[in-house]
Amino acid sequence: MAGRRETGSGGKRGRKRSRLPVASEGWPFILVPAAIAAGLALSGRRKLALPFAAASAASLGFFRDPERQTPTLQHAVMSPADGRVMEVADAVDSFVGPAVRIAIFLSPLDVHVNRAPLSGLVVSAEYAAGKFAAAFRPGIEESNERCAIHIQGETARVTVVQIAGVAARRIVCRVAAGDKLEAGERFGMIRFGSRTDCYVPRGTDVRVRVGDRVVGGVTVIGVLP
């Protein structure tokens, strides 16, 4: 199955979501098996309907998109994703320069909507085709399919990278160059797991460690210098 990146039209309209706490990208995965299950059940084939009903329920859980209250803290960098911190390491980013990379692993049970780590202007959203290796393998940040979103904040630059994995083969990015983001605002998602990396300037007071659980748009992962 080939990977694919989806983009919105840019601006607020491109980032519009459904009113229900479910990401709009999830409805086909929820409604189609639900309709099949209903049809089978109505025709008396209830046992055959069960797998489709289960698939619909699982998709409803996967594509959940709860409302979040983002803290208003000066110079704070919010987690761009739900998950577990798998790496905190010095790195060099083409946009940020000398940086600290905070890598977050998203399991299939996590919320998979990505959120802006800080308020600022999207300078670019750069997609790169690549492999679909497991998210925990070293070096996948440079070899896997990914989309890097470069954000110019009030005082610093930050890069967020959506990285596809073995099961996650569709990156959804709803922003483009020139869009403005607020801290904690939704900007995309990675379907069915994988990893989100956040590059912050070196010297940032990193507030998380490997193994910590983080919540997108809520957990402060660092304070800018």
For each predicted feature, which ranges?
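Contiguous, well-folded functional domains in the mature portion of proteins
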Residues: 2-225
